[in-house]
């Protein structure tokens, strides 16, 4: 026989707070959820994300492993 009263209480209208404001309601086992970041203020979703690439990942890799950046991919596959 299944045990009774083992499941947590379910709150179908749990409020999600960000910076003291209710940003959405969700279903949860807690009545209130406090978050620092959500899709409404995250730079990726708001379009304010800045990509900072000071050196260039490919150039850094090529320099680190002593490969020349003038060699094309077609020359590498002929081997």
Curated annotation (Swiss-Prot):
One Pfam family this sequence matches: Ribosomal_L31
GO molecular function: rRNA binding; structural constituent of ribosome
Lineage: Bacteria, Bacillati, Cyanobacteriota, Cyanophyceae, Nostocales
Protein family (similarity comment): Belongs to the bacterial ribosomal protein bL31 family. Type A subfamily.
Assembly: Part of the 50S ribosomal subunit.
Record protein name field: Large ribosomal subunit protein bL31
Species name: Nostoc sp. (strain PCC 7120 / SAG 25.82 / UTEX 2576)
GO biological process: translation
Listed InterPro entries: Ribosomal_bL28/bL31-like_sf (IPR034704), Ribosomal_bL31 (IPR002150), Ribosomal_bL31_A (IPR027491), Ribosomal_bL31_sf (IPR042105)
Gene: rpmE
Protein's job: Binds the 23S rRNA.
